[in-house]
Swiss-Prot record:
The name this protein goes by in its record: Cytochrome c oxidase assembly protein CtaG
Record's function text: Exerts its effect at some terminal stage of cytochrome c oxidase synthesis, probably by being involved in the insertion of the copper B into subunit I.
PANTHER family: CYTOCHROME C OXIDASE ASSEMBLY PROTEIN COX11, MITOCHONDRIAL-RELATED, CYTOCHROME C OXIDASE ASSEMBLY PROTEIN COX11-RELATED
Periplasmic domain ranges by topology: 31-195
Cellular component, GO annotation: plasma membrane
Organism in which the protein naturally occurs: Paracoccus denitrificans (strain Pd 1222)
């Protein structure tokens, strides 16, 4: 009987170690898998990237609203240059966003984006976008940043998205470079202390 227990304990330890390794591997793979899943399905408002404008333009119109947000530590003013745009489904359009660096130092940022309602994300195609690369603005610099897009004509045939005629394209700019030592010291002073 005592010969069976060590083998049983060894097997249990090996199985538990395998479970731990499997959980670690799944945790590591979850983020890239979720990103891939969102790009393929348009889940969570993820948009597509198109190589060229659509070949199919319908007579039906759709309204696209534009939204802009900037992370508080960015130091930029960021806003859409038009609140909304009405266009034909499948028609290529260009919208502009304005960014102003209000700091006394160069700041690099990147924009994350989303489309609402989520079901429209799969049909919202960007051809060119400032969100594809990091943007660096010099102190006081003002830029107009374009986004070229279209809403795929297949939207009207989709069971979930077929009735959508209002879409919101939203961007949030985040700082990607570490703040200068002077700014980091100011940020540290303003952070509340927790006891």
């Amino acid at each position: 009987m005592s010969g069976g227990k060590p083998r049983s304990n060894t097997r249990t330890v090996a199985m538990l170690a395998g479970v731990v390794v499997l959980m670690g591997a799944l945790s590591w793979a979850a983020v890239p898998f979720y990103s891939w899943f969102c790009k393929v399905t348009g889940f969570a408002g993820t948009t597509n990237v198109a190589e060229a404008a659509s070949d199919t333009v319908l007579d039906e119109k759709i309204r696209v609203r534009f939204d802009a947000n900037a992370d508080s530590n960015l130091g930029w003013t960021f806003r859409p240059m038009q609140r909304e745009m009405e266009l034909k489904i499948g028609e290529n359009a260009i919208a502009f966003y304005e960014a102003i660096n209000n700091t006394d130092e160069p700041v690099t940022g990147t924009a994350s984006y989303n489309v609402a309602p989520d079901a429209a994300g799969y049909f919202f195609n960007k051809i060119e976008c400032f969100c594809f690369t990091e943007q660096t603005l010099q102190p006081g610099e003002r830029v107009e940043m374009p986004v070229s897009f279209f809403v795929d004509a297949d939207l009207v045939n989709d069971r979930d998205a077929g009735r959508i005629r209002d879409i919101t394209l939203s961007y949030t700019f985040h700082r990607t470079d570490p703040p200068a030592p002077k700014q980091a010291a100011l940020d540290a002073k303003t952070e509340p202390t927790v006891n």
